[in-house]
């Protein structure tokens, strides 16, 4: 089961809040489907920071072996969020496959 934590959303302008929340909930559902047989409860953490004109968005997901963390910067917070989630998807799938490969290797020995 994946739990979603949104931090510092108040730094983002009000007009983007609903769009950001819907994107995050969709991604949470995606990760729930991907990790439905995973035996550890996961937390998907999305953090927003605003410095001058740029939004820095970072997302992390705790897996068994390590914490996968991805960060992006953009002027538009929604674009930055989409970039973060696409990069996080690649990194999480890669790490998940490594964990699976390691598990199968240990099981055969």
PLM regions: where:
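Polyanion-binding surfaces on beta-sheet-dominated domains and ring/shell assemblies
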Residues: 1-109
């Amino acid at each position: 089961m994946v739990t979603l934590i949104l931090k510092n959303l108040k730094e983002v302008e009000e007009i983007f809040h609903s769009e950001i929340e819907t994107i995050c909930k969709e991604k949470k559902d995606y990760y729930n489907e991907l990790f439905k047989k995973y035996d550890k409860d996961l937390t998907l953490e999305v953090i927003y920071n605003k410095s001058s004109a740029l939004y820095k968005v970072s997302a992390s997901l705790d897996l068994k072996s390590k914490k996968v963390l991805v960060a992006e910067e953009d002027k538009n917070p929604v674009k930055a969020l989409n970039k973060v989630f696409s990069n996080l998807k690649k990194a999480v799938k890669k790490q998940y496959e490594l964990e699976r490969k390691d598990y199968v290797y240990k099981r055969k020995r």
